[in-house]
């Protein structure tokens, strides 16, 4: 992504109203997933569903692995390299690849897809929308969110491969 591409993609959101809207959508999509997942785990525990252990372990272990990789790779963010003002305000330096927000939403989506396919499909759409927000918001390059999505999908494939 070049500075010009970013400016073109983010132009429709470069107003106080557009910035508020994008930040709210980013916040709400993130919170939706981060609220739904623990509720899912509680439901699995309450019903003594044997899928609860893998539903906890797959996201937890893969989240840890992605976090370690991000720290080691330490890719810069668009606002560090392109001299842009991001719409989603962030002061963090580096640790952009892969997007952990997008990874998390996709591994959660895969968890739901394994447990309840219609809910999983909804969360996959949420993941795509969040990925778009993160790029338009200027906090990730397209490669960051694509890698995050693919890593989340790959981690979630463990449900079908192992259990």
Task: Tell where the protein language model's regions lie, with residue ranges.
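Membrane-interface junctions
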Residues: 27-31, 45, 115-118
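Alpha-helical transmembrane segments of integral membrane proteins
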Residues: 36, 50-58, 119-122, 143-147
